[in-house]
Regions:
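Conserved small/polar residues in nucleotide/adenosyl-binding loops
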Residues: 397-406
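Pre-active-site segment of Zn-dependent metallo-hydrolases
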Residues: 15-20, 27-88, 92-132, 182-193, ...
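Active-site metal-binding loops of divalent metal-dependent hydrolases
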Residues: 14, 36-39, 95, 157, ...
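Active-site-proximal loop/helix segments of hydrolase catalytic cores
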Residues: 155-160, 166-200, 206-216, 341, ...
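Active-site neighborhood of phospho(di)ester-bond hydrolases with catalytic His/Asp-centered motifs
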Residues: 62-71, 91-93, 153, 178-180, ...
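Core dinuclear metal-dependent hydrolase active-site scaffold
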Residues: 1-60, 134-191, 320-327, 345-348
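Metallo-beta-lactamase
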Residues: 101-160, 289-329
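Hard-cation-handling environments
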Residues: 229-238, 244-372
Length: 406
């Protein structure tokens, strides 16, 4: 519209909730969408962001979409835009492009396996891929008539980025930063997030762990806690099953397990990977420049130094193999999707193994309100499960953690 320059950010998801991240940046001349995610919930009416908001329509008025990273709560609904007529570019890093395609295809697969109609088709995903424009960190790009954008490392998952927008020019320039999901310390996989920018007029920052009670352990402490739990469970011939996101947390847990087994503090057991974990891990190996120096060196040297090549990691190849694992009394570890237990193979392991006192359900990631994972984390000893259209009640045995036992 004519008149003095202005910028507006409209929240279309992820505020006062976890998931379905979507922001609309509107100026005199442009409209840019940042992320387009799904909400991790069993309430299907709340899965999608607010596509019907007046500011969003018509979709062909949107100049560009920018994706911060490839977790489903940020990319799960992107193909819906193309289903309903969006034809513009999608800006993201190369790893984000590869991972989001993998996870969107899996999103369809999981929905169909649970008897639900997915919100988009494979052809919508293919249309989305055609419109992706790869961006490297530190590379300034014109994405709209009055918006230049630079992406920088956010330290969260492979290819994750903070989005720095320079809107307008001269004395009317406004600098807007979307942090994306961020990690401030070096992790098993990545360097710490970039936090130095020349100037920021407006900051939109994620706050998943922003509450006064959200005190996170250090990486070293979290690793030690996980390794202690594994040692404790295996000592009583039990099984450990972990709900994980296929991207990011899975690879971190694999590295922690690999370190433990190579230390010879415990006899190694098979670690089953169920879901898209192996495929996501392969994408990590194809983008070594996005990993921290230590891990990149191990992967390039290959052989036994590459933690992801260790012999104890095995992929679950079929439903029949999963059923065999479920009935096998041999101690083992399972990493399975989905990370918040809203679906996926982890639910099968949970139904079979949770009632057994010797087994351990281990949460290694955030559990959003309204998910099965959150109910369990909050201590519910009875939870309803839907199996082939029928509601089951699962009774749980909760054992104290090694730390609780002092």
């Amino acid at each position: 519209r004519p008149g003095p320059p202005w910028v507006r950010v409209t929240a279309l998801g992820s505020y006062r909730e976890v998931g379905r991240a979507m922001h609309l940046v509107t100026t005199n001349e442009s409209k840019v969408l940042v992320d387009c995610g799904a909400k991790p919930t069993n309430n299907r009416s709340e899965v999608q962001p607010f596509f019907a908001a007046p500011e969003m329509l018509p979709l062909d008025n949107i100049d560009a979409v920018v994706i911060t990273h490839a977790h489903v709560d940020h990319i799960g609904m992107l193909p819906v835009l193309f289903k309903y007529g969006y034809k513009g570019p999608v800006y993201c890093t190369q790893p984000t492009r590869d991972l989001m395609t993998l996870l969107q295809m899996d999103y369809i697969k999981v929905a169909q396996a649970e008897g639900n109609d997915p919100p988009y088709s494979k052809s919508d995903i293919q249309e989305c891929i055609k419109h992706v424009v790869d961006i490297n960190w530190g590379e300034k790009t014109d994405i709209a008539p009055d918006i230049k954008m630079t992406m920088e490392n956010a330290g969260h998952i492979l290819g994750s980025s903070s989005v720095y927008m320079q809107i307008g020019e001269g004395r009317n320039e406004h600098k807007l930063l979307f942090s994306g999901d961020i990690k401030y310390e070096k992790s098993w996989l990545f360097d710490a997030a970039t936090v130095r920018f020349n100037k920021v007029d407006t900051l939109v920052v994620e706050s998943t762990y922003g509450g006064p009670q959200s005190i996170q352990p250090t990486r070293q402490q979290a690793t030690q806690d996980l390794q202690d739990l594994i040692i404790d469970t295996l000592s009583r011939k039990g099984k450990i099953f972990c709900p994980v996101f296929a991207v990011g947390r899975s690879q971190e847990v694999m590295m922690a397990i690999d370190e433990l087994f190579k230390s010879e503090k415990v006899t190694p057991v098979t670690v089953w990977l169920d879901g898209m974990i192996s495929e996501a891990t392969a994408i990590h190996t194809s983008h070594p420049n996005y990993l921290n120096k230590d891990l990149r060196g191990k992967m390039l040297r290959g052989g036994s130094e590459n933690p992801f090549n260790s012999k104890w990691f095995k992929q679950v190849e079929s439903r029949e193999q999963r059923e065999s694992i479920l009935l096998d009394p041999t101690p083992c570890i399972v990493l399975a999707t989905s990370g918040m237990m809203t679906g996926g193979p982890i639910v099968e392991y949970f139904k079979y193994w949770a009632p057994e006192p010797g087994n351990t359900l281990c949460f290694v990631g955030y559990q959003a309100s309204g998910t099965l994972g959150r109910r369990l984390q909050d201590g519910h000893s009875q939870v309803p499960l839907v199996d082939k259209g029928q509601t089951l009640i699962c009774l749980l045995y909760t054992s104290p953690s090694p730390r609780d036992r002092g």
